[in-house]
Curated annotation (Swiss-Prot):
It comes from the Viruses. Belongs to the SPP1-like portal protein family. Forms the portal vertex of the capsid. This portal plays critical roles in head assembly, genome packaging, neck/tail attachment, and genome ejection. The portal protein multimerizes as a single ring-shaped homododecamer arranged around a central channel. Binds to the terminase subunits to form the packaging machine. It comes from Clostridium phage phiCD119 (strain Clostridium difficile/United States/Govind/2006) (Bacteriophage phiCD119). Its main location: virion. Keywords: Capsid protein, Viral capsid assembly, Viral contractile tail ejection system, Viral genome ejection through host cell envelope, Viral genome packaging, Viral penetration into host cytoplasm, Viral release from host cell, Virion, Virus entry into host cell. InterPro entries: Portal_protein_SPP1_Gp6-like (IPR021145), Portal_SPP1-type (IPR006428). This is Portal protein. It is found in: Virion.
Length: 451
């Protein structure tokens, strides 16, 4: 693709990029209330309204982390054609960082509507000879990625534009210099451009073309749902209103925290003298005017509608969790709840997580296929994925179901769903070893009996 066309595509991407950055700012508890406040303040015209509290609430962060932890506290398990040796190779390539990266993908997708994972081959050289190759992968900021799809029902990924800014040291300068990088990836090559400054419209410094060997665009999209909609879009307006009500409440408490004194025929020169006398002597002096009216002191206290604000805050908080499909809040005690009751408690979170899992299954399938291609494996049929939710459960019920399932369904499936089993392969190995020892013991006892 020509550079000018790439520049035009990046220029047209500003609105999408801004929307993504806004969602991320809410995740870091930097809501719009911090920029806008409750109302535009003009202290000269309205000196009684000086407070400008801007209270940002992190409901969005709570809901996103809740979903990511619910889905990816435990690693996704992959099984390729029930081939234990191949499964171990894939697990080794994924590495110890896989669970953390999967969780980060869920957070990024929840914030931005989609998350992107980039994979590549890290090569080690001895002279000009390649001595080692390692499959690497990592999560890329969504705002940096512009996907280009082929026309068709399946919307196959044709190319990816990635653009980002980097600060680099420059010889002879104390401060770092900003450079803009633009990468254009296809299924065969990478075109990489470097520009001076914070825009791809600056002067071009270098351009390199590199070939890669994956025969596919080395990026995988992980969508939050079929609409690629962020979680924030479901409840942003409600959250903004909650921030405004709470901030306005704090402003009222700060502005109207003192009693207003109404003075009649005060025998002093200014109000500061009145406050000094009241504080020091607990009394004030008053005078009688020309008409014979004596002075006096009255107080006025403004009532703040506390109860009304409390009610609307409770309604808004409940609606945030309803729209965000989060776990029910302020639940005091579940006790020894049954499995059915616990599933009902998680029902909304499970519905939301199920939409993400459906999209992630297809994406993880592409990642595993790329790893198998790197390993030189082509003769496989099925990639099975197993997800384990991080949720409260009734272990007694689960163990009872597992016991009653023995002899009805395969042992490996029982182990996969047993509440005490984290590593299915290890549990199966120990189980078979134990069965072997028991069989050997029975055989020895029989031989001793016959002798």
């Amino acid at each position: 693709m020509e550079l000018e066309k790439i520049r035009a595509i990046i220029s047209a991407d500003a609105a999408r990029r801004q929307e993504i950055l806004q969602a991320k700012s809410y995740y870091y508890n930097k809501n719009d209330i911090l920029k806008k406040g409750v109302v535009v303040q003009n202290r000269d015209e309205n000196p009684l309204r000086n407070a400008d509290n801007r209270i940002s609430h992190n409901f969005h962060e709570i809901l996103v982390d809740e979903k990511a932890s619910y889905m990816f506290t435990y690693p996704v398990l992959f099984d390729i054609d029930n081939n234990k040796e191949l499964n171990e190779k894939v697990t080794d390539v994924l590495g110890n960082e896989f669970t953390r990266k999967a969780k980060n993908l869920a957070i990024e997708a929840s914030n931005c509507g989609s998350a992107w994972l980039h994979y590549w081959i890290d090569e080690e050289y001895s002279g000009e000879q390649v001595t080692n190759q390692t499959f690497k992968y990592g999560v890329v900021n969504t705002e940096e990625i512009i996907p280009i799809y082929r026309n068709g029902i399946e919307r196959e990924l044709e190319a990816v534009i990635r653009y980002y800014i980097q600060l680099e040291d420059v010889k002879g300068q104390i401060q770092k210099q900003a450079y803009t990088y633009v990468e254009f990836w296809t299924d065969k090559i990478l075109d990489k451009y470097k520009f001076f400054g914070v825009s791809c419209c600056g002067s071009q410094i270098e351009h390199i073309t590199v070939q890669h060997r994956f025969n596919s665009v080395p990026f995988v999209e992980f969508s939050n749902n079929i609409k690629k909609q962020s979680d924030l879009s479901k409840y942003k307006k409600i959250l903004d209103l909650y921030d405004r009500v709470m901030s306005g409440f704090a402003n009222d408490l700060e502005d109207i925290q003192q009693i207003i004194y109404i003075l009649e025929n005060f025998g002093g020169e200014d109000t500061s003298e009145f406050l000094k006398e009241l504080k020091r002597y607990k009394t004030i002096k008053t005078e009688t005017d020309s008409e014979g009216d004596s002075g006096g002191l009255k107080t006025m206290q403004i009532e703040i509608p506390t109860e009304a604000r409390k009610i609307i805050l409770e309604i808004l908080k409940k609606q945030i969790y309803e729209s965000g499909q989060g776990l029910q809040q302020d639940t005091e005690n579940f006790g020894n709840a049954s499995g059915v009751a616990l599933k009902f408690f998680y029902r909304k979170l499970e519905l939301k997580s199920g939409l993400l899992e459906t999209e992630f299954r297809t994406s993880f399938d592409k990642l595993i296929k790329a790893i198998l291609y790197f390993l030189g494996v082509t003769d496989y049929k099925k990639i099975q994925q197993t997800y384990t939710r991080n949720m409260m459960s009734n272990d007694l019920e689960d163990a009872d179901i597992a016991t009653k399932s023995v002899g009805i369904i395969p042992t490996k499936i029982i182990l996969r769903h047993h509440p005490w089993v984290d590593d299915v392969e290890e549990a199966e190995k120990l189980y078979l070893e134990e069965k072997k020892i028991q069989a050997s013991k029975v055989s020895d006892d029989y031989n001793n009996f016959t002798e």
